[in-house]
A protein has these predicted regions:
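Catalytic domains of riboflavin
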Residues: 1-263
């Protein structure tokens, strides 16, 4: 179900995790008016009938936490404007997505390491788009880590908060017509943020990290990392001053996505 997240796949995974034949029988529970029951109704039904209840999201989180799903495939020296780093390429065994870790200095003790989990943004990271703060955050994170003398950047292939490059460009079209970044994703049929940080946590653990200081403004990212056994130290904020092109974007991240940004 890590390739396709659905109830059918979840039934098969539950059987497999129980050590049984990977097959299952599913049914849809209806409300009295004939509509499909949703989570609140299903939780009540389960409680009334003494049935164990879990969500698809909980099953995904369990697998990400307990199964190793990424492995390193290549490693090389990477000279940059922020010093010389070590770049490690990883492949996801489930969907074959490729991610990288940039390692600066010696992080072998695994303790109190400065870390940035950064989701891919072609427009911001490569073309220096002013619509978002992604490119600025990546550059600033590299500067902070270089000044610290050691740290890690995990660069995840999660373009457009997980919707992909072309869908992100479609979202930009909607933003040009007045939608904000959350509304645009929703109008395209996506949740505001589809990113998952479990793979990033697995990469950090593979590098031997135990406790980290995350460079982020996103509380959801911190919860996502802590849930995989990493100890979190003090958060390091990374706030770009607003300008005409990104002011609305930053307001939306603060007001609708819960990012820790100033008023």
């Amino acid at each position: 179900m890590l390739q396709r997240v659905g109830h059918t796949e979840a039934a098969v995974d539950l059987a497999r995790l129980a050590g049984r034949l990977p097959s299952g029988v599913i049914c849809e529970i209806l409300n009295e008016d004939g509509t499909a029951a949703r989570r609140p109704q299903l939780e009540k039904f389960a409680q009334e009938h003494g049935i164990t209840f879990i969500s698809v999201a909980q099953l995904v989180a369990h697998r990400l936490k307990n199964e190793r799903l990424v492995h390193p495939v290549a490693e090389a020296r990477l000279p940059t404007d922020h010093g010389t780093w070590r770049i490690v390429g990883y492949k996801n065994d489930v969907d074959e997505q490729e991610h990288v870790a940039l390692v600066y200095g010696e992080v072998g003790d695994g303790e109190n390491t400065l870390v940035r989990i950064h989701s891919k943004c072609l427009t911001g990271d490569v073309f220096h788009s002013l619509r978002c703060d992604c490119g600025w955050q990546l550059d600033t994170a590299m500067s902070l880590i270089a000044a610290e003398g050691r740290g890690v950047i995990v660069y995840l292939d999660q373009e457009g908060r997980g919707i992909g490059l072309l869908n992100k460009l479609k979202a930009y079209e909607l933003q040009d017509r007045g939608a904000d970044t959350v509304e645009a994703n929703e109008q395209l049929g996506f949740k505001p943020d589809l990113r998952n940080y479990g793979i990033g946590a697995q990469i950090l653990l593979d590098l031997g990290l135990k406790s980290i200081r995350p460079i982020t403004n996103n509380p959801r990212k911190m919860v996502g990392l802590e849930g995989y056994g990493l100890r979190l130290g003090d958060r390091v904020p990374i706030v770009q001053p607003a300008h005409d092109e990104n002011a609305e974007y930053l307001r939306t991240k603060r007001d609708k996505l819960g990012h820790l940004l100033a008023s």
